[in-house]
Amino acid sequence: MKRSAFFISDGTGITAETLGQSLLAQFENVTFSKFTRPYIDSMEKARAMVQQINIAAEKDGHRPIIFDTIVNQDIREILATSNGFMIDIFSTFLAPLEQELSEHSSYSVGKSHSIGHNSNYMERIEAVNFALDNDDGARTHYYDKADLILVGVSRCGKTPTCLYMAMQFGIRAANYPLTEEDMERLQLPNALRAHKHKLFGLTIDPDRLTAIRNERKPNSRYSSYAQCEFEVREVENLFRRENIPHINSTHFSVEEISAKILVEKGVERRFK
Protein backbone atom coordinates (compact mmCIF):
# COMPACT_ATOMS: atom_id res chain seq x y z
CA MET A 1 0.00 0.00 0.00
CA LYS A 2 1.19 3.50 -0.80
CA ARG A 3 0.08 6.61 1.11
CA SER A 4 1.14 10.24 1.13
CA ALA A 5 2.06 11.95 4.39
CA PHE A 6 2.32 15.69 4.97
CA PHE A 7 4.15 17.35 7.86
CA ILE A 8 2.68 20.84 8.03
CA SER A 9 3.60 23.70 10.34
CA ASP A 10 3.47 27.47 10.62
CA GLY A 11 7.03 27.25 11.97
CA THR A 12 10.02 25.14 10.97
CA GLY A 13 8.10 21.88 10.76
CA ILE A 14 10.67 20.10 12.92
CA THR A 15 8.18 18.98 15.57
CA ALA A 16 5.57 17.75 13.09
CA GLU A 17 8.17 15.93 11.02
CA THR A 18 9.99 14.33 13.96
CA LEU A 19 6.88 12.95 15.64
CA GLY A 20 5.20 12.08 12.36
CA GLN A 21 8.23 10.16 11.11
CA SER A 22 8.42 8.21 14.37
CA LEU A 23 4.77 7.20 14.14
CA LEU A 24 4.88 6.25 10.46
CA ALA A 25 7.96 4.10 11.06
CA GLN A 26 5.74 1.68 12.99
CA PHE A 27 3.94 0.68 9.78
CA GLU A 28 6.55 -1.30 7.85
CA ASN A 29 4.13 -2.66 5.22
CA VAL A 30 3.04 0.79 4.05
CA THR A 31 5.13 2.89 1.66
CA PHE A 32 4.86 6.60 2.44
CA SER A 33 5.61 9.51 0.14
CA LYS A 34 6.57 12.20 2.64
CA PHE A 35 6.27 15.96 2.21
CA THR A 36 7.39 18.57 4.75
CA ARG A 37 5.70 21.96 4.40
CA PRO A 38 7.00 24.57 6.89
CA TYR A 39 5.81 28.17 7.31
CA ILE A 40 2.20 27.62 6.26
CA ASP A 41 1.32 30.82 8.09
CA SER A 42 -1.40 32.45 6.00
CA MET A 43 -4.82 31.48 4.74
CA GLU A 44 -3.59 31.82 1.16
CA LYS A 45 -0.82 29.29 1.81
CA ALA A 46 -3.31 27.03 3.58
CA ARG A 47 -5.62 27.01 0.56
CA ALA A 48 -2.69 26.13 -1.71
CA MET A 49 -1.81 23.36 0.73
CA VAL A 50 -5.35 21.98 0.51
CA GLN A 51 -4.94 21.73 -3.26
CA GLN A 52 -1.68 19.76 -2.86
CA ILE A 53 -3.31 17.39 -0.39
CA ASN A 54 -6.33 16.80 -2.62
CA ILE A 55 -4.12 16.14 -5.66
CA ALA A 56 -2.18 13.54 -3.64
CA ALA A 57 -5.43 11.94 -2.49
CA GLU A 58 -6.66 11.63 -6.07
CA LYS A 59 -3.33 10.27 -7.28
CA ASP A 60 -2.97 7.67 -4.50
CA GLY A 61 -6.60 6.66 -4.23
CA HIS A 62 -6.30 7.14 -0.47
CA ARG A 63 -6.52 10.25 1.67
CA PRO A 64 -3.10 11.51 2.82
CA ILE A 65 -2.04 11.49 6.47
CA ILE A 66 -1.51 15.03 7.78
CA PHE A 67 0.58 15.81 10.85
CA ASP A 68 0.29 19.48 11.77
CA THR A 69 1.47 21.87 14.44
CA ILE A 70 -0.53 24.86 13.23
CA VAL A 71 -1.30 27.43 15.91
CA ASN A 72 -3.75 29.63 13.99
CA GLN A 73 -7.31 28.29 14.25
CA ASP A 74 -8.39 29.81 10.92
CA ILE A 75 -5.54 28.08 9.09
CA ARG A 76 -6.33 24.77 10.77
CA GLU A 77 -9.95 25.05 9.71
CA ILE A 78 -8.92 25.58 6.08
CA LEU A 79 -6.65 22.53 6.20
CA ALA A 80 -9.51 20.51 7.68
CA THR A 81 -11.48 21.00 4.46
CA SER A 82 -8.92 18.90 2.56
CA ASN A 83 -9.39 15.27 1.69
CA GLY A 84 -6.83 14.21 4.28
CA PHE A 85 -6.71 12.48 7.67
CA MET A 86 -5.52 15.17 10.08
CA ILE A 87 -3.55 14.60 13.27
CA ASP A 88 -3.26 17.91 15.11
CA ILE A 89 -0.24 17.24 17.29
CA PHE A 90 -0.60 20.24 19.59
CA SER A 91 -4.30 19.84 20.32
CA THR A 92 -3.91 16.07 20.77
CA PHE A 93 -1.30 16.40 23.50
CA LEU A 94 -1.74 19.88 24.95
CA ALA A 95 -5.34 19.46 26.12
CA PRO A 96 -4.63 16.55 28.52
CA LEU A 97 -1.43 18.29 29.67
CA GLU A 98 -3.36 21.47 30.44
CA GLN A 99 -5.82 19.44 32.48
CA GLU A 100 -3.09 17.63 34.39
CA LEU A 101 -1.05 20.79 35.05
CA SER A 102 -4.08 23.03 35.68
CA GLU A 103 -2.39 25.57 33.44
CA HIS A 104 -3.17 26.95 29.99
CA SER A 105 -0.44 26.50 27.39
CA SER A 106 0.99 29.47 25.48
CA TYR A 107 0.30 27.58 22.22
CA SER A 108 2.89 29.66 20.39
CA VAL A 109 4.47 28.79 17.07
CA GLY A 110 8.11 27.64 17.04
CA LYS A 111 8.36 27.72 20.82
CA SER A 112 10.78 24.82 21.17
CA HIS A 113 13.06 25.85 18.30
CA SER A 114 13.22 29.65 18.44
CA ILE A 115 16.55 31.29 19.20
CA GLY A 116 14.99 33.99 21.33
CA HIS A 117 13.43 31.51 23.74
CA ASN A 118 16.13 28.84 23.64
CA SER A 119 19.03 29.45 26.00
CA ASN A 120 20.69 26.32 24.62
CA TYR A 121 21.23 27.77 21.14
CA MET A 122 24.84 28.84 21.69
CA GLU A 123 25.69 25.55 23.38
CA ARG A 124 24.40 23.73 20.32
CA ILE A 125 26.53 25.85 17.99
CA GLU A 126 29.63 25.45 20.16
CA ALA A 127 29.16 21.68 20.29
CA VAL A 128 28.83 21.47 16.50
CA ASN A 129 31.94 23.61 16.04
CA PHE A 130 33.80 21.37 18.49
CA ALA A 131 32.79 18.24 16.55
CA LEU A 132 33.94 19.78 13.27
CA ASP A 133 37.22 21.12 14.68
CA ASN A 134 38.05 17.78 16.28
CA ASP A 135 36.92 15.51 13.45
CA ASP A 136 38.98 12.62 12.13
CA GLY A 137 41.85 13.12 14.58
CA ALA A 138 42.67 16.51 13.03
CA ARG A 139 43.34 17.99 16.46
CA THR A 140 43.99 16.22 19.72
CA HIS A 141 45.07 19.01 22.07
CA TYR A 142 41.46 19.92 22.92
CA TYR A 143 40.47 16.42 24.04
CA ASP A 144 40.45 17.59 27.66
CA LYS A 145 37.34 19.61 26.77
CA ALA A 146 35.56 16.68 25.09
CA ASP A 147 32.63 14.88 26.67
CA LEU A 148 33.28 11.86 24.47
CA ILE A 149 35.87 10.62 21.97
CA LEU A 150 34.67 8.09 19.40
CA VAL A 151 37.28 5.72 18.01
CA GLY A 152 37.16 3.15 15.23
CA VAL A 153 38.22 2.38 11.69
CA SER A 154 37.78 4.92 8.93
CA ARG A 155 34.17 5.25 7.63
CA CYS A 156 32.41 3.37 10.42
CA GLY A 157 30.06 6.24 11.33
CA LYS A 158 32.04 8.31 13.81
CA THR A 159 31.56 11.74 12.21
CA PRO A 160 27.76 11.66 11.72
CA THR A 161 27.33 10.32 15.24
CA CYS A 162 29.43 13.14 16.71
CA LEU A 163 27.51 15.76 14.75
CA TYR A 164 24.15 14.30 15.72
CA MET A 165 25.02 14.34 19.43
CA ALA A 166 26.24 17.91 19.09
CA MET A 167 23.11 19.11 17.30
CA GLN A 168 20.58 17.26 19.41
CA PHE A 169 22.12 17.26 22.88
CA GLY A 170 24.99 19.76 22.94
CA ILE A 171 27.51 16.95 23.49
CA ARG A 172 31.11 17.86 22.65
CA ALA A 173 32.30 14.77 20.83
CA ALA A 174 35.62 14.30 19.06
CA ASN A 175 36.52 11.34 16.89
CA TYR A 176 39.79 9.60 16.13
CA PRO A 177 40.37 7.07 13.33
CA LEU A 178 42.54 4.16 14.38
CA THR A 179 45.27 3.46 11.84
CA GLU A 180 46.85 0.24 10.66
CA GLU A 181 49.90 1.12 12.76
CA ASP A 182 47.73 1.39 15.89
CA MET A 183 46.22 -2.01 15.12
CA GLU A 184 49.57 -3.70 14.63
CA ARG A 185 50.83 -2.34 17.96
CA LEU A 186 47.57 -3.39 19.62
CA GLN A 187 47.72 -0.37 21.88
CA LEU A 188 46.15 3.05 22.02
CA PRO A 189 47.97 5.96 20.39
CA ASN A 190 49.60 8.42 22.77
CA ALA A 191 46.98 11.09 22.01
CA LEU A 192 44.23 8.87 23.45
CA ARG A 193 45.83 7.28 26.49
CA ALA A 194 45.26 10.19 28.85
CA HIS A 195 41.59 10.29 27.84
CA LYS A 196 40.78 6.59 27.95
CA HIS A 197 37.80 7.21 30.24
CA LYS A 198 36.18 9.26 27.45
CA LEU A 199 36.62 6.67 24.71
CA PHE A 200 33.83 4.76 23.02
CA GLY A 201 34.42 2.44 20.10
CA LEU A 202 32.42 1.94 16.92
CA THR A 203 32.84 -1.17 14.83
CA ILE A 204 31.06 -2.34 11.68
CA ASP A 205 30.57 -5.48 9.59
CA PRO A 206 33.42 -5.83 7.05
CA ASP A 207 31.11 -6.26 4.06
CA ARG A 208 29.24 -3.07 4.95
CA LEU A 209 32.53 -1.21 5.42
CA THR A 210 33.70 -2.46 2.02
CA ALA A 211 30.56 -1.10 0.36
CA ILE A 212 30.93 2.30 2.03
CA ARG A 213 34.62 2.64 1.17
CA ASN A 214 34.03 1.57 -2.43
CA GLU A 215 31.84 4.63 -2.87
CA ARG A 216 34.81 6.79 -1.89
CA LYS A 217 37.78 4.87 -3.34
CA PRO A 218 36.58 2.06 -5.60
CA ASN A 219 38.87 -0.86 -6.46
CA SER A 220 41.55 0.19 -3.98
CA ARG A 221 43.35 -1.65 -1.20
CA TYR A 222 41.61 0.71 1.22
CA SER A 223 38.18 -0.54 0.12
CA SER A 224 39.02 -4.22 -0.41
CA TYR A 225 37.20 -6.78 1.70
CA ALA A 226 40.48 -8.25 2.94
CA GLN A 227 41.64 -4.87 4.24
CA CYS A 228 38.28 -4.05 5.81
CA GLU A 229 38.07 -7.46 7.48
CA PHE A 230 41.61 -7.07 8.84
CA GLU A 231 40.97 -3.59 10.25
CA VAL A 232 37.66 -4.52 11.87
CA ARG A 233 39.13 -7.66 13.46
CA GLU A 234 42.18 -5.86 14.82
CA VAL A 235 40.23 -2.87 16.12
CA GLU A 236 37.81 -5.16 17.95
CA ASN A 237 40.82 -6.94 19.48
CA LEU A 238 42.15 -3.55 20.59
CA PHE A 239 38.80 -2.60 22.13
CA ARG A 240 38.76 -5.84 24.13
CA ARG A 241 42.42 -5.52 25.14
CA GLU A 242 41.97 -1.95 26.37
CA ASN A 243 38.50 -2.61 27.82
CA ILE A 244 36.89 0.08 25.66
CA PRO A 245 33.08 -0.12 25.44
CA HIS A 246 31.91 -0.44 21.84
CA ILE A 247 28.99 -1.31 19.59
CA ASN A 248 28.55 -2.49 16.03
CA SER A 249 27.04 0.36 14.02
CA THR A 250 25.98 -1.74 11.02
CA HIS A 251 22.30 -2.17 11.81
CA PHE A 252 21.64 0.93 13.91
CA SER A 253 20.62 4.45 12.93
CA VAL A 254 22.70 7.40 14.10
CA GLU A 255 19.94 8.18 16.61
CA GLU A 256 20.13 4.68 18.08
CA ILE A 257 23.93 4.69 18.16
CA SER A 258 23.97 8.05 19.96
CA ALA A 259 21.42 6.95 22.56
CA LYS A 260 23.33 3.75 23.29
CA ILE A 261 26.61 5.64 23.67
CA LEU A 262 25.16 8.19 26.10
CA VAL A 263 23.58 5.46 28.23
CA GLU A 264 26.71 3.29 28.24
CA LYS A 265 29.03 6.20 29.14
CA GLY A 266 26.61 7.91 31.51
CA VAL A 267 27.05 11.25 29.76
CA GLU A 268 24.29 13.73 30.55
CA ARG A 269 22.71 15.64 27.69
CA ARG A 270 23.25 19.38 28.01
CA PHE A 271 19.69 19.91 26.84
CA LYS A 272 16.78 17.71 25.85
Swiss-Prot record:
One of the Pfam families matching this protein, by short name: Kinase-PPPase
E.C. number: 2.7.11.33, 2.7.4.28
Transmembrane annotation, as ranges: none
Catalysed conversion reaction: [pyruvate, water dikinase] + ADP = [pyruvate, water dikinase]-phosphate + AMP + H(+); [pyruvate, water dikinase]-phosphate + phosphate + H(+) = [pyruvate, water dikinase] + diphosphate
Source superkingdom: Bacteria
Keywords: Kinase, Nucleotide-binding, Serine/threonine-protein kinase, Transferase
Protein's UniProt keywords contain Transmembrane helix: no
Binding site for ADP: 152-159
Enzyme class, broadest EC rank: transferase
One GO molecular-function entry: ADP binding
Role according to the record: Bifunctional serine/threonine kinase and phosphorylase involved in the regulation of the phosphoenolpyruvate synthase (PEPS) by catalyzing its phosphorylation/dephosphorylation.
Family the entry assigns: Belongs to the pyruvate, phosphate/water dikinase regulatory protein family. PSRP subfamily.
Protein name as catalogued: Putative phosphoenolpyruvate synthase regulatory protein
Species the sequence originates in: Pseudomonas fluorescens (strain ATCC BAA-477 / NRRL B-23932 / Pf-5)
